[in-house]
C-alpha cells in the first residue's frame, strides 16, 4: 500500500491532511544521555518540541518528503536482544542484557513496551537494524489520537533513542503529524535538529534546538 494521504493499520486510520491553522511545532531537540558504559557508543534521545497541549501521532516519510535518520562518521549501535521500535524494548530483561536499554530504536513518547500502543507500517527495518540509515518514502510509526503517549510532556515528545559510534553524529530529517491543543491536525515536514558530535555525549548536555519550520 502506498503511503500518501492515509495510513491504514490494525488500530484504525490516521489521516495525513494538514490544516491551514498555525502549527504548534516549535522545533526539535537532541539530548545526550549517560548510558553508563552499558553499550559501546554515544546515546541520544530525539524530541519534537511543541506548544502546550499538542501531541505527535505519526512520524512518516512519503514520496514528497523522505524520512532519513543517519549517522555521520559511524553507524547505529544495536542490541541483539532488541528491535527497531520501543515495542521491542522489554524492561524485564534490562538486568540480564544491559545493552537493551540503550540500543537504537524509534518510538512515540515511551522508552519501553510497557503500556505502549505504538504501531508501524511500510518501513523496511533491515538496514537500520544492521547499523545503517533509517530511510522511508512510504512508511510510518504512529499511535492513534486517543493514545496518551503522543501528548507533549514538558513541551516535547520523544520520537527515538539512537546510540551511535563513539564520536559520530546523528543527522537527518523527519516529518510529523499531530494535533494542537484544540484537536486540530497539523503537519511539519523536512524538520531537522542540530547534529550533536560525540564529544558532547556527556550527561547534562541537552536541548540542542533544531531549526523551526511551520506548515
Please annotate each region the language model reported.
Residues 214-215:
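Membrane-interface capping segments at transmembrane-helix boundaries
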Residues 1-8:
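Bacterial N-terminal signal peptides that target proteins for export
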Residues 23-193:
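Non-catalytic macromolecular-recognition regions in eukaryotic signaling proteins
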Amino acid at each position: 500500500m502506498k503511503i500518501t494521504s492515509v495510513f491504514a493499520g490494525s488500530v484504525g486510520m490516521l489521516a495525513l491532511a494538514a490544516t491551514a491553522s498555525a502549527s504548534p511545532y516549535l522545533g526539535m531537540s537532541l539530548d545526550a544521555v549517560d548510558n553508563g558504559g552499558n553499550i559501546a557508543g554515544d546515546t541520544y534521545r530525539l524530541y519534537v518540541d511543541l506548544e502546550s497541549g499538542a501531541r505527535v501521532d505519526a512520524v512518516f516519510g512519503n514520496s514528497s518528503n523522505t524520512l532519513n535518520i543517519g549517522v555521520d562518521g559511524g553507524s547505529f549501535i544495536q542490541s541483539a536482544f532488541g528491535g527497531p521500535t520501543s515495542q521491542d524494548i522489554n524492561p524485564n530483561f534490562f538486568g540480564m542484557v544491559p545493552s537493551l536499554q540503550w540500543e537504537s530504536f524509534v518510538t512515540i513518547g515511551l522508552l519501553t513496551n510497557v503500556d505502549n500502543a505504538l504501531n508501524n507500517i511500510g518501513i523496511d527495518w533491515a538496514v537500520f537494524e544492521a547499523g545503517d540509515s533509517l530511510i522511508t518514502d512510504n512508511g510510518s510509526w504512529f499511535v492513534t489520537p486517543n493514545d496518551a503517549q503522543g501528548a507533549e510532556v514538558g513541551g516535547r515528545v520523544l520520537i527515538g533513542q539512537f546510540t551511535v559510534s563513539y564520536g559520530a553524529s546523528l543527522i537527518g530529517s523527519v516529518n510529523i503529524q499531530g494535533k494542537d491543543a484544540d484537536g486540530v491536525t497539523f503537519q511539519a515536514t523536512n524538520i531537522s535538529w542540530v547534529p550533536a558530535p560525540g564529544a558532547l555525549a556527556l550527561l547534562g548536555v541537552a536541548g540542542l534546538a533544531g531549526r523551526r519550520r511551520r506548515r
